[in-house]
Amino acid sequence: MKTTIEKGKCYEIGDWLVQIDSIDEHHIWGFGADSDRVMGFLALPIDSQVTREVSINDYINYIDVTRQNIAAEFRERLSQYEE
């Protein structure tokens, strides 16, 4: 069964949690996070496998954890260059 996606809603698409910004004939555009260290605006192929719809609260929590993980990694990398 194919999941219908809608602008403004959040979905798990592959390894990404994405809030959909727009959809065109080739891409699904949105802001999302992948695993624990990558986040940003992205374009996924229109035929990407949508696993499930995600609640906005789950999406926000996931983005927040990703942001914290990125900040921690950034601090760790900077500490390597401190005297």
Per-region residue spans from a language model:
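Short, charged low-complexity linear motifs
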Residues: 1-2, 73
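Short coil-to-beta transition motif at edge beta-strands of beta-rich domains
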Residues: 2-14
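Assembly/interface hotspot detector across virion components, adhesins/toxins, and nucleic-acid enzymes
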Residues: 10, 18-20, 26-27, 50-54
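Acidic interaction surfaces
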Residues: 14, 23, 79-82
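Basic/aromatic-rich interaction segments and small domains that mediate binding to polyanionic partners
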Residues: 16, 21-43
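Intrinsically disordered, low-complexity, charged/polar segments
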Residues: 37-83
